[in-house]
């Protein structure tokens, strides 16, 4: 099914997965300069990752809807990635597979959709305006196209401010998983007005 045939997918309001663990603590100590060599080295290490995957809890909260789910994100190559949203029983509510020039999404009824742009597809199908193209960088702790950002005292991204398609996204990082090398985000919150997107990563596998 192509883009003009999109129907709204209503993910289950999975109240049992409220992200209490995703409350973002304040950062300790002064932030570091974006011009520091430590920050440049950290960015280089992250960008050199060929494959990675993470799973955890997802929440989308707005005046119109509240969605809670589990997520699985896997990148297998340049611009090739897979995103799953599942309910508490482990059933897939949404599966997205993207590669250059082609995006496929399967809903919880097995209906398949295709399009060129994953971000547009997610927005039209779910009603959630997730900045997926930028989130692919932000979830790694990289600023992407944003030039307004701050670092924490460990030379890692702590905040991003980015204007996109009339929206002013603010991204705040609540911590990093130091068990991985390089350290990867452990939880983060995106906000634009009354809209909030929360992600809590259980673990990372990087290569």
Curated annotation (Swiss-Prot):
HAMAP family: LolB. Pfam families: LolB. It comes from Salmonella typhimurium (strain LT2 / SGSC1412 / ATCC 700720). A lipid is attached at residue 22 (N-palmitoyl cysteine). Monomer. CDD domains: LolB. Belongs to the LolB family. GO terms for biological process: lipoprotein localization to outer membrane; protein transport. Keywords: Cell outer membrane, Chaperone, Lipoprotein, Membrane, Palmitate, Protein transport, Signal, Transport. It is found in: Cell outer membrane. A lipid is attached at residue 22 (S-diacylglycerol cysteine). GO terms for cellular component: cell outer membrane. Plays a critical role in the incorporation of lipoproteins in the outer membrane after they are released by the LolA protein. Residues 1-21 form the signal peptide. This is Outer-membrane lipoprotein LolB. It is a lipid-anchor.
């Amino acid at each position: 099914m192509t883009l003009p045939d999109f129907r709204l997918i209503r993910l289950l309001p999975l109240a049992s997965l409220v992200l209490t663990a995703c409350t973002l603590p304040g950062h300790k100590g002064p932030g570091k300069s974006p011009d520091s060599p430590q920050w440049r080295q950290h960015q280089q290490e992250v960008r050199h990752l060929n494959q990675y995957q993470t799973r955890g809890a997802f929440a989308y909260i707005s005046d119109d809807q509240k969605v809670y789910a589990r997520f699985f994100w896997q990148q297998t190559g340049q611009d090739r990635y897979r995103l799953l949203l599942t309910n508490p029983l482990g059933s897939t509510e949404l599966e997205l597979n993207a590669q250059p020039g082609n995006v496929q999404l399967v809903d919880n009824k097995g209906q398949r959709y295709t399009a060129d742009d994953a971000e547009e597809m997610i927005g039209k199908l779910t009603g959630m305006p997730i900045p997926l193209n930028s989130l692919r960088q932000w979830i790694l702790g990289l600023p992407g196209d944003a030039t307004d950002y701050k670092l924490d005292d460990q030379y890692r991204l702590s905040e991003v401010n980015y204007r996109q398609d009339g929206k002013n996204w603010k991204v705040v990082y609540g911590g990093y998983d130091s068990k991985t090398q390089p350290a990867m985000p452990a939880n983060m919150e995106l906000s634009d007005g009354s809209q909030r997107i929360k992600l809590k990563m259980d673990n990372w596998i990087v290569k």
